[in-house]
């Protein structure tokens, strides 16, 4: 019998959630995703030193201002790692906009344009890139404009149904609802443990998937942020699942039977009228878990972006 990972690949598009090129070569995913934390982690791999040197050398040619050089080097490093990863995945690379821009629609759009330009200068067409944005109201509005320009987006840090609905209504290409971080919050809040079937993160992704399929939304659902293989197996059939190297290895070494859990609705019904900003903000605010986890996620990505920039600044000196 095929291993668990191979069985999953027959039901769901598997994406590698890593900046580690060796892991991508090993597990042969369709797509790859990174974020500021993963770029920081990747930058500490000795083999990546040339990419950092290349990014810094390039940044020095773009500006004499140190702050601008640091920003440019960070963008160039993320894109350079993305370009390398795209040599080993047939599909798309998700590269994230600076989390510190999560509440600024125009600056998010500007950063997306810059990242796409850097990819194009490296010979990568925008059709192979997904721009990752936090699922704030501003991020969703930025994505709506980018999608209308033909730049596809991946809306991340998604913890609530309100965020998922707003993303679909904005015509976003793909959403990344977080599973494990939802589980973390509920375990801490309630003090209880959950099975894969009762996992609040699994239930959230299932609800989003069913809503999208029922109402004919084309937005791709990509479950993310997993704590264990049970969560992953319980979402077999989801459009895509993005999985870190440790769990990919565990799945590859398992022979557990995989059964399709998520299936598209046989009949579709008309979607409700799009949410207003006020409706979105109210519905989102009603979900204490989502409010906590979105804020925490943005803060933590910003912290890791800052750590990366400290490292780049030291090398620029």
Swiss-Prot record:
The active site is at 132 (schiff-base intermediate with substrate). The keyword Transferase applies. Its EC number is 2.2.1.2. It comes from the Bacteria. CDD domains: Transaldolase_TalAB (cd00957). It is an enzyme of class 2 (transferase). GO terms for biological process: carbohydrate metabolic process; pentose-phosphate shunt. InterPro entries: Aldolase_TIM (IPR013785), TAL/FSA (IPR001585), Transaldolase_1 (IPR004730), Transaldolase_AS (IPR018225). It holds the Pfam family TAL_FSA. GO terms for cellular component: cytosol. Keywords: Cytoplasm, Pentose shunt, Schiff base, Transferase. PROSITE patterns: TRANSALDOLASE_1, TRANSALDOLASE_2. Its main location: cytoplasm. It catalyses: D-sedoheptulose 7-phosphate + D-glyceraldehyde 3-phosphate = D-erythrose 4-phosphate + beta-D-fructose 6-phosphate. Belongs to the transaldolase family. Type 1 subfamily. This is Transaldolase. It comes from Shewanella denitrificans (strain OS217 / ATCC BAA-1090 / DSM 15013).
